[in-house]
A protein has these predicted regions:
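Active-site glycine-centered loops adjacent to acidic/histidine catalytic or metal-binding residues
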Residues: 19-20, 106, 145-146
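Short acidic, glycine-rich surface-loop motifs adjacent to enzyme active sites
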Residues: 92-114
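Extended active-site neighborhood of metal-dependent phosphoesterases/phosphodiesterases
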Residues: 1-97, 119-141, 152-186
């Protein structure tokens, strides 16, 4: 991957977001599962500014409780850890409320059909509004993927989610990939 990026996309600046296939399943703890990723690509959560916009990258892939060596990448909680949420709140203290904020996590905040958030926040059942309230007063665009669908959701006037689907489109279940054309379901 790094060789391809360094040779093919070397003139682009890339910002990585950890997803459900980016963990090392042979080890035990969640932090250890993400160690190769954080040592080679990017921190699991971080922020940066480009122009007059603030970008926040969060990790909501929690593999806590998955035994070492058990490669079941579909068994995880959609969870923001307590330390990550504390960091997020501290980060936002340094961002003027008039600054546009873009937040990204691999998992979306709700499913394509609009049903609620089935994840956890700080290891407990989460209320989506509790997470969104952290960004009160900011104009936020939440960017997500994972679903293999493309959809947009407005949670309130200042918090909107754009789910981009997956770059692999539907080949993973259809077994069909049109050369040069990758299509994800819209809606």
């Amino acid at each position: 991957y790094k060789n391809t990026i360094n040779s093919t996309l070397r003139n682009l600046t890339l910002f990585h977001t950890m997803g459900n296939h980016d963990n090392e399943m042979e080890v035990g703890e969640d932090w250890a599962k993400s160690l190769k990723y954080t040592q080679n690509l990017a921190p699991d959560y971080y922020s940066f500014n480009i122009g007059k916009c603030h970008y926040i990258v969060l990790d909501n892939m929690d593999y806590e409780g998955i035994a070492a060596g058990h490669d079941n990448r579909s068994k995880y909680a959609r969870n923001y850890t307590a330390s990550q949420l504390a960091w997020l709140k501290k980060d936002l203290e340094h961002v003027d409320k008039s600054t546009p904020v873009f937040v990204t996590s691999h998992e979306p905040l709700s499913s394509p059909d609009g049903t609620g958030w089935d994840g956890e926040l700080n290891g407990k059942d989460a209320d989506l509004n509790e997470f969104i309230s952290i960004f009160e007063g900011y104009d936020v665009r939440f960017l997500s993927g994972h679903t293999h669908n493309i959809y947009h959701r407005t949670y309130n006037q200042n918090f909107k989610e754009h789910n981009s689907g997956a770059v692999c489109a539907s080949w993973w279940w259809s077994g069909y990939m049109t050369p040069g054309v990758h299509i994800a379901q819209d809606g």
